[in-house]
Amino acid sequence: MGTPNDQAVLQAIFNPDSPFGDIVGLDLGEEAEKEVDEGEVFPRAQLEQSKALELQAVIAAEAGDLSTALERFGQAINLLPERASAYNNRAQARRLQGDVAGALEDLERALALSGGRGRTARQGFVQRGLVARLQGRDDDARRDFERAARLGSPFARRQLVLLNPYAALCNRMLADVMGQLRRPCDER
């Protein structure tokens, strides 16, 4: 019938309400999240100021003021240039502004600073995977979503199911069958 992973993907398609952890065969080797205690790495006053600037930036971005958001993220980065979170968040604002190259540059920096671990890395892999998917680079997207899924991202797990060619085929066949069932008998 297929590999255990293929069977797990089919299980996820036909039983979408099942938690991914309960799907036999879908073993992504989830890594325990190892979050660095930033309070031990960065001076407390600078860390608090950096977080406050990031919060201001997020609020500005949510209000649609991307230029202010980018300015605040830049200030947070200048304050603590070795802190991954601000790069990750600025990447999102840059992407929303249409600066995909700048977003990817920030994501690379965030992933390097995070060491590929923790919440910031999980978000960075998801963002980079989304950019790759939008650019039609599905293999790169799959690799990033796999890394994010191992770090505990349910969104990345759903993206992996959607990127699976068997899932795409099953979804297409299921849509065809459902379309036929919805048509009146005389049209079939």
Curated annotation (Swiss-Prot):
- What's a single GO BP term from this record? tyrosine metabolic process
Q: Does the keyword Repeat apply?
A: yes
Instruction: Tell me the SUPFAM superfamilies matching this sequence.
Output: TPR-like
For this protein, the record's Pfam families field holds:
TPR_2
InterPro entries linked to this entry: TPR-like_helical_dom_sf, TPR_2, TPR_rpt, TTC36
Q: Where are the TPR repeats?
A: 50-83, 85-117, 122-155
Q: Which UniProt keywords apply?
A: Repeat, TPR repeat
Q: List the PANTHER family.
A: CDNA SEQUENCE BC021608, TETRATRICOPEPTIDE REPEAT PROTEIN 36
Q: Which protein family is it in? A: Belongs to the TTC36 family.
Record-given protein name: Tetratricopeptide repeat protein 36
Which organism is the protein's source? Answer: Bos taurus
> Which gene underlies this protein?
TTC36
